Design a protein with these regions (language model features):
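N-terminal membrane-targeting/pre-transmembrane regions
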Residues: 1-41, 121, 137, 147-149
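Generic detection of short hydrophobic beta-strand segments and adjacent strand-loop junctions
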Residues: 3-9, 87-89, 142
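A residue-level signal for beta-strand positions that form part of recognition/binding surfaces
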Residues: 4, 68, 129
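Short, solvent-exposed secondary-structure boundary motifs
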Residues: 15, 50-62, 112-114, 119-123
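Hydrophobic alpha-helical transmembrane segments
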Residues: 41-53
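Conserved beta-hairpin
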Residues: 53-96
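Non-transmembrane, membrane-adjacent beta-strand/coil modules in membrane-associated proteins
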Residues: 78-141
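C-terminal/domain-terminus segments
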Residues: 142-159
Length: 159
C-alpha cells in the first residue's frame, strides 16, 4: 500500500467571507461611534479598544486551522484542531460518492464531526460538499472549497 497523498486541503476558520464581513462591520461601527463621541466621554476609548480587538482576533482567526482533509491509502483522513481526533473514512466501505450543495441556507456554522440525523458533517466554508454514503446508510458530508479535485481524488482512490 502506498502512503502517497493524492489530495490535501486545509480549511481555516477566519477566511469565510460573510463572518469576516460581519466582524469588520462591527469594528467599523466601533470606530465610527468613537469618532462621534465627545472628548469628555471615556466610553469612546473603550470602543476604540474593542474595534482594534475585533480586527486582531479576525487576523488571528485567518491563520487558525479548522481541519485538514487528505485522501491517501484508499481512505479519507480528516484531522482538526488540537483536541479533535483523527477521523478515517475507509473508501472500501463507500457505496456512493456525489458532489452536492452543502446546505440550503446562506449562513452555515463551521462544524467538525457533527453527528445529526444519520449524517456526519465536516464544514468550514464554501457552498459545495462531497456526500459519501457507506454500506450502513450513514452519510458523510464533507464541505470543500476544491470540490472537483476532491471528488476526482476520491473516485481515483476507489478504483
Amino acid at each position: 500500500m502506498s502512503e502517497k497523498t493524492v489530495f490535501t486541503e486545509k480549511q481555516y476558520l477566519g477566511r469565510e467571507f460573510i463572518p469576516l464581513t460581519i466582524r469588520l462591520a462591527l469594528a467599523m461601527f466601533c470606530f465610527a461611534v468613537d469618532f462621534f463621541t465627545d472628548e469628555r466621554e471615556r466610553s469612546g476609548d473603550l470602543l476604540m479598544v474593542v474595534g482594534f480587538s475585533i480586527i486582531v482576533i479576525s487576523i488571528f482567526m485567518g491563520f487558525l486551522l479548522h481541519f485538514r482533509t487528505r485522501v491517501q491509502n484508499k481512505s479519507v483522513l480528516i484531522d482538526g484542531l488540537w483536541t479533535t481526533r483523527l477521523v478515517k473514512i475507509d473508501l472500501n466501505s463507500i457505496v456512493k460518492v456525489e458532489k452536492n450543495v452543502y446546505s440550503k441556507y446562506l449562513f452555515n456554522n463551521p462544524v467538525y464531526n457533527l453527528h445529526s440525523k444519520g449524517t456526519i458533517r465536516f464544514f468550514t466554508a464554501g457552498k459545495e460538499a462531497i456526500h459519501l454514503t457507506d454500506r450502513d446508510g450513514l452519510v458523510y458530508i464533507i464541505g470543500s472549497q476544491q470540490v472537483n479535485e476532491f471528488l476526482r481524488a476520491i473516485e481515483g482512490e476507489m478504483k
